[in-house]
Amino acid sequence: GGVNGPRGWATCNYVVASSMQEAVLIDLAAKVRPGVPVVFLDTGYHFAETIGTRDAIESVYDIRVLNVTPEHSVAEQDKLLGKDLFARDPGECCRLRKVAPLGKTLRGYSAWVTGLRRSEAATRANAPVIGFDEGFKLVKVNPMATWTDEDVQNYIDEHNVLVNPLIYEGYSSIGCAPCTAKPLAGADPRSGRWQGLAKTECGLHAS
């Protein structure tokens, strides 16, 4: 089906990806298409709060959570590649635990929908609302690309949207626990990710 307007979105074969940081995108998607599949990349390294948020979101919204896990558990990866790969080669850890599992999951779909926003970081400043994802070879839709932090907060307040409690502890961008810290004062919201490393993206949004 086409992707022009809500009717097109209701019929197009797409999946929503969520980090379970907040449920704004999920709230929007569930209203347009009840029962929409939502991918959550369960890396094995998440904060307990993130897993709790995922479970709460799944019980509150009319969605179908696809809990996607990597080929190997953390313990298996430690045995195969040595302990704490994230500390030695974060790029490879993200590839194995996020990018590859998502790639496999997306094979059955014609588009994926993300909560990517231009205001999150310089690396995302040119994010299109609709584009073609060269990495995963399918249409990528970022319906919130132009939203500001204020827009997100207003929507959360207005619609009583579920939020990961870590947000209120000062974490503005939440990923795997070992690679997530609170952002630096005055820096962009994603500055707490991979602090001290020359890395700003996990690779899911590389293209």
Where does each model-flagged region fall?
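Nucleotide-activated chemistry modules centered on ATP-dependent adenylation/adenylyltransferase
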Residues: 1-207
